[in-house]
Amino acid sequence: MVTPADELRCELARAGVRSGDEVIVPSYDVCETAHVVLSVGAEPVFADIDPVTFCLSAASVETAVTDRTAAVVAVHTFGHPADLAALGDVSRRHRVPVLGHGLEAEPTAAIARRRAHAQYLTARLKGVRTPRAQRAAEHGYQKYVVRVPGNGRPDRDAFARALRARGVDCQAPLLTPVHRSAAFRRELRLAETERACDESLALPLAADMTRRELQRVVSACNALGGLLQPAG
C-alpha cells in the first residue's frame, strides 16, 4: 500500500531534489513531512504559517528561499488547501517547484456534510475564533479548529478540560512545532506557528454527527462564555 509519505518521497524525486538540497516545509505539521525530506538526503527548512488557514505563508517562504532551495512542500492543513496561487508566485520568481501535500481523497457526500456541520458551528459558537476559509478555497474540514483567546496555552488547556468535563471530546491539534521538537530543535522564531500551537483546539466534527450532537458542542462552549478567566 502506497502511503502519503511514499507519495511525497516520489514527488521530491520527480522534482529533482537531491542530497544536500534544502526543502521548505511548514513547522505547524506532524514531523513526518520533515522526516521524508531527510530520507531523500535533503535538509528541511521551516517556514511560518498564515494565521487564518494554518497553511504555509508565502511571505515566510519567500524569506526562507536560498540558492540551495530545491522545492517547497505546501501541506494542506486540516482540509484547508494551501494558497498555491501565492506560493506559485514565489515558485516562479525563484524557479522552485511547489508540491501540494496532505489532502485526503474522500467521498464528496462526507465532505459536504462536514461543511454543513462546520457552518452550523460557526454560526452559533461564541467567544472562540472559528475557522474561516480563504476566498475560493474549498475547506474540507478534516478537523474543525478554533482558537481560544486569552493567555495562550494555559487558557486553551483550561478551556479544553472544562469542555471534556461537559462531555465534549476535544484536543489540541498540535502541541509542539516541528522546529522545536526533539528531532530538530532549531533556534528559529516562527511567531504564527507557535501562537497556533498555544491557542488552537480541535472540536468534534464528523460527517455522521447529528444536530443534537453538534448543539451539545455549541452549548458546552457557549456555557463557558468562550473564554475562561485568564490563567495567572
Give residue spans per PLM region.
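Conserved Walker B
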Residues: L103
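Short secondary-structure capping/turn micro-motifs that flank functional sites
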Residues: E7, T53-F54, P81, V178-R180
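PLP-dependent aminotransferase-like
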Residues: V17-T77, P81-G100
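Conserved sugar-transfer catalytic core signal across GT-A, GT-B, and GT-C glycosyltransferases
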Residues: E7, E11, T33, F159
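ANL superfamily AMP-binding
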Residues: A5-E22
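PLP-dependent aminotransferase class I/II
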Residues: A59, A71-V75, L84-A86, R93, ...
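Conserved N-terminal alpha-helix of the aminotransferase class I/II PLP-enzyme fold
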Residues: M1-L8, Y28
